[in-house]
Amino acid sequence: MQSIDLRLPSTSANHSISESLEHSKSELNELSNVSESESYFDITKKLHALSTVVQRQQREIDNQKRDLCTKTKHIEELQTLLSNANIMSDGASSQNDAFAHNPSTSVSVELVRPVVGTKKHAVYATSAPKSMSLQDSLSVPSATALADVSSSLNYSRKLSSNSIKSTNAPVFGTAVKNVTGENILSASSSEENLNSNRNGDPKFRFSVSPWISSSNFNPYEASLANFQSDNCKLKSHNSLPSIRTNVRYSNSKPSTPLSPEDVDLGTYTVKNRDSWSNEVNLSASTNNLSTNTSGTLKPYSLSSSRSSSYSKGVNSAASLQSIWETMNNSNPSVIPESTSSREPAARYRKISERNAVYDWNVIIDKIIVSNDQQSSIFLQQKLKISSYDMKQNIVDSIISQIHPLMLNRFGNFLVQRCFEHGTAPQIRQMGSAMLGNMLKLATDPFGCHVVQKAIDNVTEDIKLAMMDELFLTIDVTIMHHYACHVWQKLFETQWYEYPVNVMNRVNNALRGKWHEVAVGENGSLVVQNMFENCVEKDKRECIEEIIFHLDGIARGQWGNWVVQHMVENGQGEDLKRVIDALLNRAVEFSIDQFASKVIEKAIKSGPKNFISLYLKQITNARVDRTRQPLIDIASDQYGNYLIQQIIQLGQPAEKNLVITHIKKHMVSLRGSKYGQKVAYLVEKWNSQKQVSSVINYNCNTDL
């Protein structure tokens, strides 16, 4: 038990406080007599010091008052507990006397719950007791033996977070009437067996309550008090009346459980005693008791660590019955381990069986409604490994909901697998279902993939119908972020049964608009794809229009890639026309953010004579300025990369020409943020040239 210091504040402490107060008063008097000549600073300093002393003394007084209130409260609680202890001790003595003088009658035990403390902390008995049969072969033990065994049974248990804690711990008292010598509790087990059972559970710690040492101790109190468990907490409610529970012990063994209708919560009287099903055998040995209730025993103690009373009230008779069933079962029920973590694995193992048949529509609904990726993967695997008949059933279920699946994040993959594993009639049915929705599918981030897959698998008549529908909105779809990929797939498609010329129809639809398509982010990809996959006559009209508008296309963020493609892969007259267009605006293109990339591509991958032609254009001095365009390009944010490429990749004559012109403007280039890169490269090339010349001179002299 926690020791509590109940000493009141000593008179010496009070005397010291009074002396401090008198000392403070004297200081105030002295302060009042300060001469007028004393400085204001000294007076203020003394006032602050005095204020600090007064505050410290006031804190000491408050602390002593608080300690006094706490100790007074502890004294009142202990007095209440001691009075209740005396009442129960007197009751136990009267029970033992009654048992000793009248050993021939049947047993009737009345469980009385003494109310401890105020009404706020009152605890009521909340469990329906079961019929308890006592063994006839037991003999009356001595008072000493009962006390020893009861004290050994009444050990403490380490409290968990939800354990009952109370300094006013209620204990079921017992009033024994007409006790027989044959039906009394016996305690025959040894202390060693009990200790061995206790040591098996590390949660228990052992102590002997001071109540047990009383010579008037009643064994029934220990047994019943210990039948309080964490799992079966006895409940209370502030508004409930006092409850008295009458229990009669008999040798009968009822077979039907107690129904909620047999319990009256108002006075808690049992209407049908014969309906109690389970037994509480108070005469069980300590081994059985420790085995059957090791997880539910609670201490019978005055320890102050068990604070407050039980927390919640009783709401139904069913809850009362369940509490007593938990305590009275000889084999405590074991709560099955949760299988929630194993359910998904077991479920997927089951559904992965090769020929297992399920409601495919339910799984498809799960994909559409819940975006379930696992269901989509499962059906895709089924399409790969299942039998022919099962595949057809799955595909038929998918076709019935094909429109939402094609637009679904995970459902579109399932539809694509159906094009691979479905029969010809099913593929035709899926392709026909797409007609009338081509604009929506082609412009959808998931549907566009389904359309491309369908173009590879459907018959040409369905494919032609799809293309006809797309041509109705070619102005929108050919430059769309997703639909442009569908057009690229159409450009790559080979036609065998139908003499379809896609590019003729495309040129007719986009005549005069190719330069607009080429400068778009997605349209530029379409144009490049057409250059790679269409024959010369099909792409001629597009090429002519792009060369005519090459100035604007080369300066575009996306159009410059079209011109680069023509520079790298163009041939004959078309390439010559593109190079001439670039050289005519060489200076302007060299300092443009996007057109400079076209010039760089021409330096790296263009005709062999492009660098010489390019240098001729940028080294010609203008009439109004002595500084050559070469220096302006070398000092430009984008143009300096072009000069560096010429110094690194050009022919020796071309390199010498560039370096010769740059040396004349080294001061200007060194002062430029971007020109200094070119100046450094020129100096590096000069140093290497000097080293090589020295080596050559030495070699010649040696010879």
From Swiss-Prot:
SMART domains hit by this protein: Pumilio
InterPro entries per the UniProt record, alphabetical: ARM-like, ARM-type_fold, PUM-HD, Pumilio_RNA-bd, Pumilio_RNA-bd_rpt
Composition-biased stretches (Polar residues): 1-19, 245-258
Ribonucleoprotein as UniProt keyword: no
Species name: Schizosaccharomyces pombe (strain 972 / ATCC 24843)
Record gene name: mcp2
GO biological process, one term: post-transcriptional regulation of gene expression
Protein name per its UniProtKB record: Meiotic coiled-coil protein 2
Disordered: region residues: 1-29, 245-265, 284-309
One GO CC term on file: cytoplasm
